[in-house]
Amino acid sequence: FGVVMGHFSAITPKKDPEQIAASKGIPIKGFKEVYSRFENCLSAFLSHHTLWEKCVEDNEEYMICEHDAVFVNTVPLFLAYDKVISLGKPSYGKANLPQSLGVNPLTSKAYFPGAHAYMLKPSGARELIDRAKFDAGPTDIFLHRDRFPWLQEYYPWPVEARDTFTTIQKTKGCLAKHYYNDEYKII
């Protein structure tokens, strides 16, 4: 679909995510929950956070895709969104369908239905960074319309998460995933 992506080396538990979070002023209590492994979840959030910082520093619009993001349709070249927009089809649980084609308020869930594919502008990245200093948590849940009422999503979703493994969730966190089955790996 003509999307050329760069590669970002993720923050992993081996890189001491608690120290990195402390250096950025990010509280860690929101990452201690029943669905994910603490250090892995924190590391994933910090990877996204680092890209938000780069977005602000570069003063450029960014598209962030996780390893399991698969493009199934074209993303419009000029997408008229405000600050942050999800491109990803919900990857777990039930979801609502947006009411119109194109850019919509975040409708499928109250939070991003997975953080596997989204775009953001420097102004949106700045707001995410600032809010993370108060109540950070798992990336998709952090991107919640109660925190950021301006979040949007594009429909029909041009990106799907086609995951066969997780390095973040515990078994309980995988049960609602659309691709979860007997062969799904928790690494």
What do the predicted segments below correspond to?
Residues F1-C65, A69-I187:
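An acidic/histidine-cluster motif and surrounding catalytic segment
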